[in-house]
Amino acid sequence: MPLKVVFMGTPDFAVPTLAEIVGSGHEVVAVYTRAPAPAGRGMALRPSPVQALAERFGLPVRTPATLRSEEAVEIFRGHDADVAVVVAYGMILPPAILDAPRLGCLNLHASILPRWRGAAPIQRAVMAGDSETGVAVMRMEPGLDTGPVAMLERVAITPEMTAGELHDRLMPLGADLMNRALGALERGGLTFTPQAAEGIVYAHKITNEEARLDWAEPAQRLHDTIRGLSPFPGAFFMADLGRGPERVKVLRASLADGRAEPGTLLDAHGTVACGEGAIRLLRVQPAGKGPMEAGDFLRGRRLEPGARLA
């Protein structure tokens, strides 16, 4: 018998999972998502990707500012759901919400738990130079991503893969994994295993300070940082482009050979000396501009070999 599902999600990452659930015949009784937010040059209110899809499906959408009020809890209980599916919703679920669905709340998390619990698991895995990550379906508890895991799918992180590319790889895998988990739950065959007590690492939110490239660091670490922060928020350096220091994001780079004072531009191809080794800039985005090839950027800004990048 199809399950009655409350879906809770907000960004692009959650969209394929909602589509899979609808397509598999489960009854989505409500979709919870973050409220429309200002976006674009005109800062007009724009609904979340999940809300846009839910409205195309004709599903009821709720965008509460809080889930902690008595009214919000009663409305949630009124859905009489078998299960809630949570994918990057963006709000903490209080115990009263976690306890409301008959079969609990399932969360799709983008890591091999317990490694990279928290807000930025995809970016942190790439920034750390991990060789693999994955997606996991777990039962939610009051703790941060501490619940027992039902299903796990592993994915290799290739040496040049960016966080954006990994995000796009994990989206359909996660949707399929959650769909299979719901099928097992419907049949009464979904089992859970407690997370290991060892290997717990937290994926804290990315700060602006750690997005700035420190050329004194080893090239491998900088390369991993660039990959992990591409395309958003973007690792960056500062350069004097004729109008004072300006921020330049690095969207793609590769490891290279070279030695000089860290931050020195070594050639016209965009090779920059690091504390150990060097990296070659491949694709950059100056402030207020679109992405461009690093060679075009260097020629246009007249940055010559020997220039220092801060």
UniProtKB/Swiss-Prot annotation:
<dbReference type="Pfam" id="PF00551">
    <property type="entry name" value="Formyl_trans_N"/>
</dbReference>
<dbReference type="InterPro" id="IPR002376">
    <property type="entry name" value="Formyl_transf_N"/>
</dbReference>
<dbReference type="InterPro" id="IPR037022">
    <property type="entry name" value="Formyl_trans_C_sf"/>
</dbReference>
<dbReference type="InterPro" id="IPR005794">
    <property type="entry name" value="Fmt"/>
</dbReference>
<dbReference type="InterPro" id="IPR041711">
    <property type="entry name" value="Met-tRNA-FMT_N"/>
</dbReference>
<dbReference type="InterPro" id="IPR044135">
    <property type="entry name" value="Met-tRNA-FMT_C"/>
</dbReference>
<dbReference type="Pfam" id="PF02911">
    <property type="entry name" value="Formyl_trans_C"/>
</dbReference>
<comment type="function">
    <text>Attaches a formyl group to the free amino group of methionyl-tRNA(fMet). The formyl group appears to play a dual role in the initiator identity of N-formylmethionyl-tRNA by promoting its recognition by IF2 and preventing the misappropriation of this tRNA by the elongation apparatus.</text>
</comment>
<feature type="binding site">
    <location>
        <begin position="111"/>
        <end position="114"/>
    </location>
    <ligand>
        <name>(6S)-5,6,7,8-tetrahydrofolate</name>
    </ligand>
</feature>
<protein>
    <recommendedName>
        <fullName>Methionyl-tRNA formyltransferase</fullName>
        <ecNumber>2.1.2.9</ecNumber>
    </recommendedName>
</protein>
<dbReference type="GO" id="GO:0004479">
    <property type="term" value="F:methionyl-tRNA formyltransferase activity"/>
</dbReference>
<dbReference type="InterPro" id="IPR036477">
    <property type="entry name" value="Formyl_transf_N_sf"/>
</dbReference>
<keyword id="KW-0808">Transferase</keyword>
<dbReference type="InterPro" id="IPR005793">
    <property type="entry name" value="Formyl_trans_C"/>
</dbReference>
<comment type="similarity">
    <text>Belongs to the Fmt family.</text>
</comment>
<dbReference type="GO" id="GO:0005829">
    <property type="term" value="C:cytosol"/>
</dbReference>
<keyword id="KW-0648">Protein biosynthesis</keyword>
<dbReference type="InterPro" id="IPR011034">
    <property type="entry name" value="Formyl_transferase-like_C_sf"/>
</dbReference>
